[in-house]
């Protein structure tokens, strides 16, 4: 009979087979009531599952991340229960867990409306109040097919067909509703009280636009009402910071249907873009990078050699001219190898760091496009380092330091790092992989940085480091990448002459810091809610006259600041000064300079901030010095 070992090392012996729920009850009634599921010998199981042999057991409650994900998964099933009661002809598809929530894809004769979503949520609440048990039945394959055939659940039957080797499957019963799942799920609907449906969207069966369209119902679920309220508050704050709304309000950019996934940059937005580009160009130049420019449209033959034509063709825009096939480049790496290959290199010329602000295009699904965060046309701060194996660690360490310095300049100090190591299918010897992984790990260790190890998650051609930054709302954005590549230099015949006069393939380090300018600008807009630090602000100062008598001096101030390298403009409109101040405050201009008769007489400007602080009057030269100091701090003033 089983002896159960608990996480604290204590043991409990039973003279009969027990379920996870039985063990929880033997510890205490409170724990039994809170039990969502169990983890037996490291495997998640339902609370009703039996333990027949000696095992380790962790009781899973809503306080555990696994418990929260189980609650969310069960809420997806609850969506199915409610939908089938309200819309009996609907056919259920899949309902997985996602970050902070869940969704369910549903086939129905018409699109769901916000009123439908409200009705589904209300019915879910009514079902939760019934406090019913969720019943699990491990069911033979033939019987599963009978169950879903009788219910006309065509998509469930297709999913069964996808699992030809599964002879028994878990069916979970919510009263009259039944769903199929590996589980585990909550034992009772009382765990599902803290949920909310959040949005509706379209989707496609198996994610393929060629297949039938489905309705997707999104929701979130939490362990308690307090967590749910905090999440809703974060979402409301995120909606206030939506880069699409702020971008329109501040006149930064727009998108339109005639060019899906492409950005129309307006003067203010393009100024911001250029500030980023000029900053990154300076950073790269100071760190030994050589800037290059490569073609946008490249013959199919190069993409075949690189492997992109075979593995990435669906994401590439292609064209034809004079009986030749071309692709608009989706990435820059093959072209950078062509630059490296011009003239045989010596080991003395390595490392060679080639950088490009490379415009790329990828045929992303239209449903996945999102403002400037997910686009089809974008520019990467892309670079490739060609080096020897002995140089991998030093180059990696230098890049890590550079990346963190850049993020700090933009105001991001909370950075998460992940090291992904060799997958089962890979190219290159184990010895080379060992050296590469050790190089990346040592580079991270030498920087004193904690990181998450992700075994088996590397690309087939080399290990990688991912850099993710946290914004002011605690959201995590994966931006930077350092990817070692043993494969592409071989495929594209990149070689150098080594110290012993033999020819060797260099190691290629793919690296990006911002990722893409478009997405990074979107992150900045939402992080700062459009109130950029002075060094990034498209307009750093606006000069406003009170009456026409001060117009000439206002123009002089604008000229002086512009000649000092600042982005300043005058507002000489015949409007009340309060109106002008309010308008430019809403446009998030960092500094508002007011000029009246006294300022003309004293040759000064009255300085206000967009936050409403009155900095008093000062000579123009003094303000220029003040602004220069603010610009020099970049985004660090709020983080140090």
Curated annotation (Swiss-Prot):
Note describing how the cofactor binds: Binds 1 zinc ion per subunit.
Signal peptide: none
Molecular function terms from GO: ATP binding; metal ion binding; threonine-tRNA ligase activity; tRNA binding
Region (Catalytic): 242-533
Keyword ATP-binding: yes
Residues that bind Zn(2+): 333, 384, 510
Any single Gene Ontology cellular-component annotation: cytosol
GO biological process: threonyl-tRNA aminoacylation
EC class (word): ligase
Function: Catalyzes the attachment of threonine to tRNA(Thr) in a two-step reaction: L-threonine is first activated by ATP to form Thr-AMP and then transferred to the acceptor end of tRNA(Thr). Also edits incorrectly charged L-seryl-tRNA(Thr).
Family the entry assigns: Belongs to the class-II aminoacyl-tRNA synthetase family.
UniProt protein name: Threonine--tRNA ligase
Gene: thrS
């Amino acid at each position: 009979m089983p002896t159960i070992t608990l996480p604290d090392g204590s043991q409990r012996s039973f003279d009969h087979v027990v379920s996870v729920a039985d063990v929880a009850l033997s510890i205490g009634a409170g724990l039994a009531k809170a039990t969502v599921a169990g983890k037996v010998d490291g495997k998640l199981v339902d609370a009703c599952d039996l333990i027949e042999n000696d095992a380790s057991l962790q009781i899973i409650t809503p306080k555990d991340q696994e418990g929260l994900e189980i609650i969310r998964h069960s809420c997806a099933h609850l969506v199915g229960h409610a939908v089938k009661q309200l819309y009996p002809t609907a056919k259920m598809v899949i309902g997985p867990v996602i970050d902070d929530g869940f969704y369910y894809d549903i086939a129905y004769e018409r699109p769901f409306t916000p009123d439908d979503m409200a009705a589904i949520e209300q019915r879910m609440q009514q079902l939760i109040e019934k406090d019913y048990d969720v019943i699990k039945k491990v069911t033979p394959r033939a019987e599963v097919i009978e169950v879903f055939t009788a219910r006309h659940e065509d998509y469930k039957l297709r999913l069964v067909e996808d699992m030809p080797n599964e002879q028994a499957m878990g069916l979970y019963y919510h009263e009259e509703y039944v769903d199929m799942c590996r589980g585990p799920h909550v034992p009772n609907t009382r765990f599902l009280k803290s949920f909310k449906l959040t949005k509706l969207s379209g989707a496609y069966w198996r994610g393929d636009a060629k297949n039938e369209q489905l309705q997707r119902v999104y929701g979130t679920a939490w362990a308690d009402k307090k967590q749910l309220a905090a999440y809703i508050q974060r979402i409301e704050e995120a909606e206030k910071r939506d880069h699409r709304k702020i971008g329109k309000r501040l006149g930064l950019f727009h998108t339109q249907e005639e060019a899906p996934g492409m950005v129309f940059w307006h003067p203010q937005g393009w100024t911001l873009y250029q500030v980023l580009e000029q900053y990154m160009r300076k950073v790269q130049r100071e760190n030994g990078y050589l800037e290059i420019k490569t073609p946008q449209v490249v013959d199919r033959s190069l993409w075949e050699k690189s492997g992109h034509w075979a593995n990435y063709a669906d994401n590439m825009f292609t064209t034809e001219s004079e009986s030749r096939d071309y692709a608009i480049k989706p990435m820059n790496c093959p072209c950078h190898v062509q630059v490296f290959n011009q003239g045989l290199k010596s080991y003395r010329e390595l490392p060679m760091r080639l950088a490009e602000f490379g415009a790329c295009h990828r045929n992303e699904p239209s449903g996945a496009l999102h403002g400037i965060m997910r686009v089809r046309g974008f520019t990467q701060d892309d670079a490739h380092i060609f080096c020897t194996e002995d140089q991998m660690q030093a180059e990696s360490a230098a890049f890590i330091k550079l990346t963190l310095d850049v993020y700090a300049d933009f105001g991001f100090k909370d950075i998460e790092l992940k090291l992904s190591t060799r997958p089962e299918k890979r190219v290159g010897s184990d010895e080379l992989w060992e050296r590469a992984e050790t190089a990346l790990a040592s580079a991270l260790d030498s920087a004193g940085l904690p990181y998450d190890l992700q075994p088996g998650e590397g690309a087939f051609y080399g290990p990688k480091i991912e850099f993710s930054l946290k914004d002011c709302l605690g959201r995590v954005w994966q931006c930077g990448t350092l990817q070692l590549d043993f494969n592409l230099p071989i495929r594209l015949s990149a070689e150098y002459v080594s110290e012993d006069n033999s020819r060797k393939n260099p190691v290629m380090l793919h690296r990006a810091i911002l990722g893409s300018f478009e997405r990074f600008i979107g992150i900045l807009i939402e992080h700062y809610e459009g109130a950029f630090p002075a060094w990034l602000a498209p307009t750093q100062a606006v000069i406003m006259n009170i009456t026409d008598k001060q117009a000439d001096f206002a123009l002089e101030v604008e000229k002086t600041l512009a000649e000092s390298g600042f982005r300043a403009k005058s507002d000489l409109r015949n409007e009340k000064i309060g109106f002008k101040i309010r308008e430019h405050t809403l446009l998030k201009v960092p500094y508002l300079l007011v000029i009246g008769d006294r300022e003309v007489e004293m040759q000064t400007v009255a300085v206000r901030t967009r936050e409403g602080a009155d900095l008093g009057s000062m000579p123009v030269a003094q303000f220029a010095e003040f602004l220069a100091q603010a610009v020099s701090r970049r985004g660090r003033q709020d983080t140090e």
